[in-house]
Amino acid sequence: IRSGPAGYCRPSPRRSNSSDLCRYPPQQHGYTPEMSSTTIPTLALNNGVHIPAIGFGVYQTPPEQTVDAVVTALQTGYRHIDTAAVYGNEREVGEAIRRSGVSRDEVFIETKTWITDYGYDAALHAFDKSAGKLGVDQIDLLILHQALPGEFHLTVAAYNALEKLYADGKVRAIGVSNFMPAHLRRLLAETATPPAVNQIEVHPYFRQSELLVFDSSHGILNQAWSPIGGITFYRDGAHNSTLENPVIADIAAEHGKTPAQVMLRWHLQQGRQVIPKSVTPARIAENFGVFDFELTTDQLTAIDGLDTGIRGGPEPEDVTREKFGVPIPEA
């Protein structure tokens, strides 16, 4: 985790593809003294842009709850908001940022292009739709949501569109989500700009070690969605919740932390960016309290050992436009 020097750097102009940003300082709006002094470590992407080590996700957050949840997250100290076109709440994310009192320059916005909008021209227009709903001219990180392996020519064309948006300064970084090594090898061979991130399912019950190594060896930052294993609660009846796992619970007790905080810390110490989600203010604050303790090597290894190899989300190979091709509304 990169924490930078004392203090924090002033963000570069939003249209720059480079960044001298070291720190995302919380604003003073509605903070306790403890939170107002917190500064978020950042991780360097392969193009020099920095991303906060922890983000706030809004997957499956209903639009009517999104504004309050995102405002709460920003007032807690989060400075990265992760949304997606298919979530149906980009507009509410933008509204929350405007209501929060936090400057746009201090918020790292990430969104995802859905498979219905793959292809070169469609992906260019998808940016316009997302930017319009978010109410911004520039998106910090734009990624392809799925590999769509059965029509990978459309995936490559969509990524070419992201490269164009990046070259034009409309996005500060580009990447992918749910790509496996075979998908990444082909993408790297057929495009010019390596993805800055690969947002994937990673949690103690599903670590994806081979993919983590592949991404790291190619300078691709791993972002963990479902970082505390929430996706497993309804997919795998053979295991108890990660929040109830005795190994994790014992480690949490040793540090005076919660199981969720221990799992997030496990990701951070292994170099992954994490995107927890919640609509509950207490949980939002709990998930942010992960920068004041450190797990031992033995504790990290013990959590690694919980891997079941069982995926909670859909298999990337099974994602097709026939099954998942919902239309994305205009801005």
Language model feature labels by segment:
Residues 5-6, 10-17:
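Compositionally biased, low-complexity flexible segments
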Residues 123-144, 164-168, 190:
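CE4/NodB-like, metal-dependent polysaccharide N-deacetylase domain
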